[in-house]
Amino acid sequence: MSSNECFKCGRSGHWARECPTGGGRGRGMRSRGRGGFTSDRGFQFVSSSLPDICYRCGESGHLAKDCDLQEDEACYNCGRGGHIAKDCKEPKREREQCCYNCGKPGHLARDCDHADEQKCYSCGEFGHIQKDCTKVKCYRCGETGHVAINCSKTSEVNCYRCGESGHLARECTIEATA
């Protein structure tokens, strides 16, 4: 999508807040996935650039909720077919909670005292968490040892407002129209 196209309908000539299709991503909108939204009033806004593909059967033209292959669906709560867990009439099955840090049951991550078993989301090593990682990775150049704000390698920046390179939107001299 070019910077001149509306984020809601994909057409050029107007900005999202002036979109004639109405709606928006704000309050009252539910994500449909793959670039579309459904409003509380039932209006659907779908990106025309991506077709609806059913993740259940892999065919285009419908979504999983409308798929004919739903007979294989089983409830995660009771294990029987014909419904899903949110519609299950059986009492909610208690599942043992596991810690996201160490993976052990019986406590949550915030109560974990297995600090030496904590896994860093940045480097993948155990013994520390991301905020304490010494092997930080720069998002600008991809190298380890520094973060983007301290990166010495210059990269071309583009303005989201006018599309020109060399400055950011907050530094743009062209007045925003949207």
UniProtKB/Swiss-Prot annotation:
Where does the record place the modification Phosphoserine?
Answer: 49
Q: Which region ranges are annotated with the description RNA-binding Arg/Gly-rich region (RGG-box)?
A: 25-38
Naming one, the record's GO cellular component terms include:
endoplasmic reticulum
Instruction: Point out which parts of the chain are CCHC-type zinc fingers, as ranges.
Output: 4-21, 52-69, 72-90, 97-114, 118-135, 136-153, 157-174
InterPro entries xref list: Znf_CCHC (IPR001878), Znf_CCHC_sf (IPR036875)
**Residues recorded as bearing N6-acetyllysine in the entry:** 8
Q: How is it modified after translation?
A: Arginine methylation by PRMT1 in the Arg/Gly-rich region impedes RNA binding.
Q: What does this protein do?
A: Single-stranded DNA-binding protein that preferentially binds to the sterol regulatory element (SRE) sequence 5'-GTGCGGTG-3', and thereby mediates transcriptional repression. Has a role as transactivator of the Myc promoter. Binds single-stranded RNA in a sequence-specific manner. Binds G-rich elements in target mRNA coding sequences. Prevents G-quadruplex structure formation in vitro, suggesting a role in supporting translation by resolving stable structures on mRNAs.
Q: How does it assemble?
A: Associates with the 40S ribosomal subunit, the 80S ribosome and with polysomes.
Record's protein name = CCHC-type zinc finger nucleic acid binding protein
Source organism (scientific name): Mus musculus
